[in-house]
């Protein structure tokens, strides 16, 4: 199936790209999500005419996302949870909880679908979490899961010590 992207799609292309994709991927994902349209002759002509508008819109979105990225950069989210004696959580810290806390911290709504967790957070410690802001731009935040505020502060001190040791070794 030949399609034209009307929104940037990670690892696929940017607005206005004409691509061949598997029929199922096009019919079941790209078209229903309004990420693409079928590449018919009238649509191709329309896209050529509107490509500058699409690029301007994408540039505007990218600038807004870069402002959000500046807010997110170096954020540390602390979650205080009850745990067993060996540090395992009763439950887990979910991408929705991370999105809610991050949205609260930066006063901008971040969707839970933009939070990329490599694995579930089920024990205390420090984790790096990726936030997908745009098809071409990701941010990283630090998530600290602890039993108490004092334990969270200990984790932060430990992390700063490790970072300063790494800098000393590289110099």
Swiss-Prot record:
Which cysteines are cross-linked by disulfides? none
**UniProt superkingdom:** Bacteria
What InterPro entries does its record include?
A: Ribosomal_bL9, Ribosomal_bL9/RNase_H1_N, Ribosomal_bL9_bac/chp, Ribosomal_bL9_C, Ribosomal_bL9_C_sf, Ribosomal_bL9_N, Ribosomal_bL9_N_sf
Pfam families for this protein: Ribosomal_L9_C (PF03948), Ribosomal_L9_N (PF01281)
The record, for SUPFAM superfamilies, names:
L9 N-domain-like, Ribosomal protein L9 C-domain
Taking the record's annotation, the residue ranges forming a coiled coil are none
GO-annotated cellular components: ribonucleoprotein complex; ribosome
Q: Which GO terms describe its molecular function?
A: rRNA binding; structural constituent of ribosome
Q: Which Gene3D superfamilies does this UniProt record tie to the protein? A: Ribosomal protein L9, C-terminal domain, Ribosomal protein L9, N-terminal domain
Its function, per the record, reads: Binds to the 23S rRNA.
Question: What family does this belong to?
Answer: Belongs to the bacterial ribosomal protein bL9 family.
Protein's recorded name: Large ribosomal subunit protein bL9
Native species of this protein?
A: Rickettsia africae (strain ESF-5)
């Amino acid at each position: 199936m030949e399609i034209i992207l009307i929104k940037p799609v990670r690892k696929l292309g940017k607005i206005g790209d004409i691509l061949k994709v598997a029929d199922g991927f096009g019919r079941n994902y790209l078209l229903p999500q309004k990420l693409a349209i079928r590449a018919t002759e009238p649509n191709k002509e329309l896209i050529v005419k509107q490509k500058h508008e699409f690029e301007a819109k994408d540039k505007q979105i990218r600038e807004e996302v870069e402002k959000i990225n500046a807010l997110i950069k170096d954020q540390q989210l602390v979650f205080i949870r009850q745990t067993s004696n060996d540090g395992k959580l009763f439950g887990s810290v979910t991408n929705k909880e991370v999105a809610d806390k991050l949205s609260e911290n930066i006063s901008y709504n971040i969707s839970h679908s933009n939070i990329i967790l490599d694995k579930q957070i089920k024990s205390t410690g420090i984790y790096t979490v990726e936030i997908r802001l745009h098809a071409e731009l990701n941010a990283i935040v630090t998530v600290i899961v602890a039993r108490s505020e004092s334990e969270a502060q200990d984790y932060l001190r430990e992390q700063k010590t490790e970072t300063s040791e790494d800098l000393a070794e590289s110099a």
